[in-house]
Amino acid sequence: MPQDKIVIHGAREHNLKNIDVEIPRDKLVVVTGVSGSGKSSLAFETLYAEGQRRYVESLSAYARQFLGNMDKPDVDSIDGLSPAISIDQKTTSKNPRSTVGTVTEINDYLRLLYARVGTPYCVNGHGKISAQSVEEIVEQILELPEKTRLQILAPVVRTKKGTHVKMFERIQKDGYVRVRVDGEVYDISEVPELDKNKKHNIEIVIDRIVVKEGIRSRLFDSVEAALHQAEGYVIVDKMDGSELLFSEFYACPVCGFTVPELEPRLFSFNAPFGSCPDCDGLGVKLEPDVDLLIPDTSKTLREGAIIYWYGKASTYYPALLEQAMEQFGIDLDRPWEKLSEKEQQIVLYGNGDKLFHFLHEGDFGLRDQDMTFVGVIPNLWRRYRSGMSESAREMARSYMTELTCTTCHGYRLNDQALSVKVGEKNIAEFSILSIGDTLDYVKSLVLSANNEIIAKPILKEIKDRLTFLKNVGLDYLTLSRSSGTLSGGESQRIRLATQIGSNLSGVLYILDEPSIGLHQRDNDRLIESLQKMRDLGNTLIVVEHDEDTMMAADWLIDVGPGAGDLGGEIIASGTPKQVMKNKKSLTGQYLSGKRAIPVPEKRRAIDKKKMVKITGASENNLQNLDVEFPMGVMTAVTGVSGSGKSTLVNSILKKSLAQKLNHNSEKPGKHKKITGYEGIERLIDIDQSPIGRTPRSNPATYTSVFDDIRDLFANTNEAKIRGYKKGRFSFNVKGGRCEACSGDGIIKIEMHFLPDVYVPCEVCHGRRYNSETLEVHYKGKNISEVLDMRVSDGLEFFRHIPKIERKLQTIVDVGLGYVTLGQSATTLSGGEAQRMKLASELQKRSNGKAFYILDEPTTGLHSEDIATLIQVLDRLVEQGNTIVVIEHNLDVIKTADYIIDLGPEGGAGGGTILAKGRPEEVAKVADSYTGQYLKAKLEK
């Protein structure tokens, strides 16, 4: 009898307190709770980990060694478990070849569509291309200049791996004596053995001929033989390094432009057959950027306008430039922007073979010689391509920018692939449409009766996948959008759409906040998609804080009551209505409205004279915007997904300020200018990335409070008597740490076919320090015991030590009092890491001149955590600082002093300012989706 629930007994992973819980199968189940309460420990580290482990356990030991080992979660038993698929936010590919089209597999179907029903057109504007006959090929060859020496080649192997021994035997058997292998001509009996793991090109030399009168018959026979051997292809090698490719398939009769046989790999930018030869299918090329080399064009050459040469300790390049320019008659004391274009070109690209005399004594001895001036940019290329060290390459790379490839114009494919159209568009033009427009185009496509039959099953797959993407709120994306530029929420919803398309049933799906980055308007479509997956017969476990998703759930599990050691218990489990009635459940209280984040009684004053102004913002979909960000207040940038929020704030505002304030070399998005930033001293980007990537990093080291604690221990009488200095109490350096475990406190034991096991160090028993160091006590505790304290306990312990007390108080203020001082940074969630960064900022003595940028800080946060976050942000603003936050959460938006709402839609339909002003003013704008939802929130 099939089970109708998943039953967990004795779950103890991380902070879970030996919990028992029953989860109904084939339902939409939401797991919620405050940040750090144990939601992910239950959903991912217990349920998903065990589902995966059981699958891997069913494989052979041989297969398991390639898959890696899965740790068994700390749980007594789990019954009723299905195969598990995790759709989280951590697996976005940063590979530049990965796009929305490749991830969703829509590109595979598109390539098939273009290969089967595409029509080639001449790239030189001569109309449709049809197949060529032998006569047409011969006529084109005879039009070559007289006395042109030719080789007629039959390409029998094109970019295929193997030794191709049988092919050579066949060629010899057919009576041919010469072959060209990978560009080299050999006698058939002297061909070297080929590497079977490399791709090779093999052409039969059919004939060698000189263009002159009376060769038509011989040429006809040779071309016909080549077409026969190579199944429709012939290469005419003009012996001067250039070649012509002809085919019985497609070639322009006017200019000879030839398209190979239409097959799916021709339309792949990841295959040499179809990719642009100049950028190898990336669509961009790394090029030196004059704006980075010369950031201040008002400077003269002598003043160091070219920071690439003047920003170093060496005097060699400044001397080289100045002596060369003086001898070439270029004014060194004239601002760069006032030099003529010819003079600028000489500085950047050199002065050809013209010599100048160079005299310089430096690190490499005396130079006294006549030499050419190669120019700044060729010198930069040389350093990048043949840098003496990785740091030299990196330095050169910092003056370069990825620019659109001038050969394919960013389309990634070669001319042959781009010449093929279905309807009125080639495959690249198809891919740059938004998903919504792509769907409309596919539906309106008119094909011939024959092509309609061929394309019908392919178009169905494409339409289905596009519809799934539209239904999860991603209709503003394009298929050509690089995966690396997607937010965590977007990449997760793409994988969600892919899973819906797979039509699997009986699967346990575990999702991590799929609503991230999604505007309230699009929430309903996401919830419908989740319900559709459930209705296919799947169990969905969603870690989520969004109220709409919680209310739409069949079952709600609230983990708490607090975070860390104060959490790990099931506070409520039932339908949303049952949880709302549970007095112990914080989630229930927020859902029922008994608890709420208040609207501020008054907003902060906005000084119109103190504004950071961006003029002419036009990156991506921004429509030449002029935007003002008021100083000394909190501004929320809002709008539907894809409306241009991240482009405006992260690509333009943040990078422009970083360039002006920190001399950052990263190029901002397109805009005319930025003004009003003179009062800013520090730019701080507070994101959810980890505060440290190794287990050695912890809250005490990150906030630098550990330095003060080590000072305190070094000043105890016992430490002074023993001669211990501050370094004795560090677990990162030799001296005071346990050398058996190098201060880690744990030892890794490799188990080969079983997961690696971490056991406490037998010497220090997990305490990180040697016994001599642990004999030093402060108020009865040694340094290891202090690291094991919760921050809240540490605050009481170090009362009246102002330096330490102040730092620990800020960690408590951001709601992280439950974290231990020595807790590994790798165990902190994104929300916890972000709040730790805020705590670190609160510790600093503020002069009110900091500019903070936060991108969706409510990710992973419960309503109770959001209330704490808002209090922290308020404190930073009260100190006179400025905050700009990208946010969809209405509780944060309603507490902002100023709102900039972009829209009205995503992608090409967005990029304009719909509303700006106080939340109450934005709520009155009927065209603003944010305003509509905000109005309802403010009226509650």
Swiss-Prot record:
Q: Where is the ABC transporter domain?
A: 309-586, 606-935
GO MF, any single term? ATP binding
What InterPro entries does the entry give? ABC_transporter-like_ATP-bd, ABC_transporter-like_CS, ATP_grasp_subdomain_1, P-loop_NTPase, UvrA, UvrA_DNA-bd, UvrA_inter
Instruction: Report the record's Gene Ontology biological process terms.
Output: nucleotide-excision repair; SOS response
Annotated Gene3D superfamilies: ABC transporter ATPase domain-like (1.10.8.280), ABC transporter ATPase like domain (1.20.1580.10), ATP-grasp fold, A domain (3.30.1490.20), P-loop containing nucleotide triphosphate hydrolases (3.40.50.300)
- Which positions are annotated as binding ATP? 33-40, 639-646
Where is the protein localized?
A: Cytoplasm
Sorted alphabetically, the keyword list is:
ATP-binding, Cytoplasm, DNA damage, DNA excision, DNA repair, DNA-binding, Excision nuclease, Metal-binding, Nucleotide-binding, Repeat, SOS response, Zinc, Zinc-finger
Domain of life (superkingdom): Bacteria
Is Nucleotidyltransferase a UniProt keyword of this protein? no
Q: Where are the zinc fingers (C4-type)?
A: 252-279, 738-764
Under the heading Pfam families, the entry gives: UvrA_DNA-bind (PF17755), UvrA_inter (PF17760)
- A cellular-component GO term for this protein: cytoplasm
Functional summary from the UniProt entry: The UvrABC repair system catalyzes the recognition and processing of DNA lesions. UvrA is an ATPase and a DNA-binding protein. A damage recognition complex composed of 2 UvrA and 2 UvrB subunits scans DNA for abnormalities. When the presence of a lesion has been verified by UvrB, the UvrA molecules dissociate.
**Family membership:** Belongs to the ABC transporter superfamily. UvrA family.
Per UniProt, subunit arrangement is:
Forms a heterotetramer with UvrB during the search for lesions.
Q: What is this protein called?
A: UvrABC system protein A
Q: Which organism is it from?
A: Lactococcus lactis subsp. lactis (strain IL1403) (Streptococcus lactis)
Gene name of the encoded protein: uvrA
